[in-house]
From Swiss-Prot:
The lineage of its organism: Eukaryota, Viridiplantae, Streptophyta, Embryophyta, Tracheophyta. This is Probable nicotianamine synthase 4. The keyword S-adenosyl-L-methionine applies. GO terms for biological process: nicotianamine biosynthetic process. It comes from Hordeum vulgare (Barley). Keywords: S-adenosyl-L-methionine, Transferase. One of its GO terms (molecular function) is nicotianamine synthase activity.
Length: 329
């Protein structure tokens, strides 16, 4: 067995053990035990690794799929918990730093804005943006609106009405960003004509848990978004925390893939930048010619400088912040 295979086996074994421990928890609501296990999971998954989750053995694949479902449930409970905590303040937006991972959203949103400006320059100052899968803590929309897109209107969509109610409460005291932020309870599969009104659509990592579901969502967006509109799709190239997105599925969905970014820091989402292709009207979806990879050239795969050492220190600090915030709440 070569060194790379040993590294992959060691990582899969470690994550399998964490999955078993997480699955035994009586609840995934925030608690010291939950926070510690998921912090260990993130610490294990974030460093660059040669593992290819598409080539895992069936048993490991089943473990990975179960782990992603647990991560989704835990993330929802974590965000609901902190959304309620923030809503207790007179102006919740003044206290977003109470959420231990808020800095990750700042970094991810900055990265996405810079990628849009670089690869889709005509869309980096959009008039209207849709965020699909915004959840009870719509930090991404807020950071983009407050720091990068001061004139843009944001429509946030989520399946969960309770999540949208929580999100709405966070903006009640803000007359600037709050006036440009709206929340809608809807399934993306039911959105049609409204999708054509957006210059940019952001697709959250947890929308479409299985690969075939993700591909259906992307094809639906490709059928209804305006020609030239940009798609920003988040996914988990590290594979154990979030579903992965195959760029080929984005191409088949009617988009031109412009760039793929795999961050090497504590941002756990990879990002794909794509643009709705005019070809979809000529050839149709499912023809294999509805979209393509970056104008017939090799798609740029970009990555910020690695700062894993800083990330380990950040994770330790965040574990302490979790404990302190829960005591205060």
């Amino acid at each position: 067995m070569d060194g790379q295979s040993e590294e992959v086996d060691a990582l899969v074994q470690k994550i399998t053990g964490l999955h078993a421990a997480i699955a035994k928890l009586p609840s995934l609501s925030p608690s010291p035990d939950v926070d510690a296990l998921f912090t260990d999971l993130v610490t294990a998954c974030v460093p660059p690794s040669p593992v290819d989750v598409t080539k895992l053995a069936p048993e490991a694949q089943a473990m990975r799929e179960g782990l992603i479902r647990l991560c989704s449930e835990a993330e929802g409970k974590l965000e609901a918990h902190y959304s309620d905590m923030l809503a207790a303040f007179d102006n919740p937006l003044d206290h977003l730093g109470v959420f231990p991972y808020y800095s990750n959203y700042i970094n991810l949103s900055k990265l996405e804005y810079e990628l849009l400006a670089r690869y889709v320059p005509g869309r980096h100052r959009p008039a209207r943006v849709a965020f699909i899968g915004s959840g009870p803590l719509p930090f991404s929309s807020y950071v983009l609106a407050a720091r990068h897109l001061p004139d843009t209107v944001f429509d946030n969509y989520d399946l969960c009405g309770a999540a949208n109610d929580r999100a709405t409460r966070l903006f009640r005291a803000d007359k600037d960003v709050g006036a440009r932020m709206s929340f809608h309870t809807a399934d993306v599969a039911d959105l049609t004509d409204e999708l054509a009104t957006y210059d940019v659509v952001f697709l959250a990592a947890l929308v479409g848990m299985a690969a075939e579901d993700k591909a259906k969502v992307i094809a639906h967006l490709g059928a209804h978004m305006a020609d030239g509109a940009a798609l920003v799709a988040r996914h988990g190239a590290r594979g154990f925390l979030y579903p992965i997105v195959d760029p080929q599925d984005i191409g088949r969905g009617g988009f031109e893939v412009l760039a793929v970014c795999h961050p090497d820091d504590d941002v756990v989402n990879s990002v794909i930048i794509a643009q709705k292709s005019n070809d979809v009207h000529e050839y149709g979806l499912g023809s294999g010619r509805g979209g393509r990879y970056a104008r017939g050239t090799v798609v740029p795969v970009v990555s910020p400088p690695c700062r894993f050492g800083e990330m380990v220190a950040d994770v330790t600090q965040k574990r302490e912040e979790f404990a302190n915030a829960e005591v205060a709440f």
